[in-house]
Amino acid sequence: DAAVKIFHGKDSIFHPSVDVVFDAANSRMLLSKSKGKFKDAPYASTYFGVDFSAERLRWDLKTDSIDIYSESAAAQAPVVIESRTHFNLSDFLLLGGAGFSFHPVVLVSTYAIENRTNTFYADDLVKKYKRKPGEIQMALEFLAQKGLIDYDIKTGKVNVKERAIHLTKSFKNK
């Protein structure tokens, strides 16, 4: 598994955990979603301002095009593309996760907004909201799997993505 960021000028496509096959002889790269904890994390495209879920990306490095596709075992599956400014109340409520006594997106976004920083540590959330470290860690891993934050489990460093803040602001304005 590898985190991959494909640059195109100032823009990029990013995924936190994919399997990479590079064919140097033919200048081709195949990215496949790993089966680990980030299997549900979307790819992020800064050029289009979207997140998208797909099983594989295939890139012939001699061209400027990337093939994006999804397949299930039985048939083709859709590639889901979602604007970072999209808000759906039902989807947002599902991001509350199961087993949390708080809404993880609201918790991290509110902390980021109130402290005017998107980067902080898990311990900051534990202290501010008086939550158990294990509960905060589970919530942060959940949000990282959904592509809403970057989370370094070893250091506890959190970077809240603009999408998470947008979701919380949209929810509070509803």
For the regions a protein language model found, what residue spans apply to each?
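Structural signature for solvent-exposed beta-strand/loop edge elements and short helix-capping sites
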Residues: 1-174
